[in-house]
A protein has these predicted regions:
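N-terminal auxiliary segments of SAM/dcSAM-dependent transferases
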Residues: 2-107
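A short linear hydrophobic-aromatic micro-motif
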Residues: 36-41, 148, 263-268
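A short helix-to-beta-strand connector/capping loop
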Residues: 71, 94, 112-113, 171, ...
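SAM-dependent Rossmann-like transferase core, predominantly class I methyltransferases
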Residues: 83-145
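Conserved SAM/SAH cofactor-binding pocket of Class I
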Residues: 126-206
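S-adenosylmethionine
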Residues: 178-283
């Protein structure tokens, strides 16, 4: 997530605007935000990003004055489409039709057994990335094997892979993300899709939560986390995993580590030759 790489002002339409405030210092997620268009609080390590649907300069500056540990860094203004990297259209992956929508207004009707309605909110990623599609494709290839299984989705983000696993037959899915905003978004998407009985979303670190029992681990996550995850005690006792979020050099390294730990590469997808996704099984 890197707002600093985006244009600071992109002339968004008033109804489609995002106002993002970058602060050094952490504002606890439970802190009340007295603003009618407050959308979310994204905490990353020692920084906070506050999202609003309209300007909140006075309120944010007030926070910085009243909390000595906060420093205002920057303010960004853009559209939802620019934040997500484009206006997402419905797409199909793993035999599922994913229909993105925004601002809590889902498409008309209820999602069918092959449908997922996805509201990314301000959590980065609308599901169209090739790693996401590859993970869904590999989940679909498991077919009947998913029935009755418990799945972990580590680094769940918007919850799409958790939703996909549940739609494809998993009995229980534990969706994990370090960011509380991602957890909240995943829970909202589970409700919209009628999957709250199957999906539990919790805040935590992938390397720690992998210790929970599961038949299958799914993780589409940054390499800096993946390299620790695949050597963690909790991962090494797992029988099967789908791993993604890896560029070519990173994928080679992870593949070598997995093989050295006794895993077999059951499948390997890289539709664009850049991003790689592995289905691995304990040998």
């Amino acid at each position: 997530m890197s707002p600093a790489a985006s244009h600071k002002k992109a002339q968004p339409n008033a109804s489609d605007a995002l106002f993002i405030y970058y602060l050094e210092g952490v504002i606890h997620p439970a802190t009340p935000m007295p603003h009618p268009d407050f959308l979310g609080n994204w905490v990353e390590e020692t920084s906070t990003f506050l999202f609003f649907g309209s300007p909140a300069d006075d309120m944010v500056q007030g926070f910085c004055r009243s909390m000595s540990h906060l420093t205002f860094i920057d303010r960004y203004e853009m559209t939802y489409e620019q934040w997500q990297g484009g206006d997402a259209e419905p797409f199909t992956a793993g035999g599922l039709t994913i229909t993105p929508f925004r601002k809590g207004t889902p498409p008309e009707g209820r999602p069918g057994p092959g449908d997922i309605f996805l509201d990314a909110g301000v959590v980065f990623g609308n599901g169209a990335h090739p790693t996401t599609s590859s993970c869904l494709s590999l989940l679909a290839r498991l077919g009947p094997e998913l029935a009755g299984q418990t799945v972990q989705d580590l680094g769940t983000g918007t919850g799409l892979l958790a939703l996909g696993a549940a739609r494809l037959g998993a009995e229980k899915v534990l969706a994990v993300d370090l960011n509380h905003l991602a957890v909240r978004t995943t829970l909202a998407n589970a409700r919209i899709n009628g999957l709250t009985r199957q999906i539990v979303a919790v805040q935590g670190r992938a390397e720690e939560m992998v210790h929970a029992p599961a038949d299958l681990v799914v993780s589409n996550i940054h390499y800096d986390i993946m390299k620790h995850l695949v050597v963690s005690e909790g991962f090494l006792i797992k029988k099967e995993a789908i791993l993604s979020g890896l560029m070519t050099t990173e994928a080679r390294t992870i593949e070598q580590v997995l093989k050295s730990k006794g895993f077999l590469i059951a499948d390997h997808l890289s539709p664009d030759g850049i991003w790689h996704t592995f289905h691995v099984k304990r040998g």
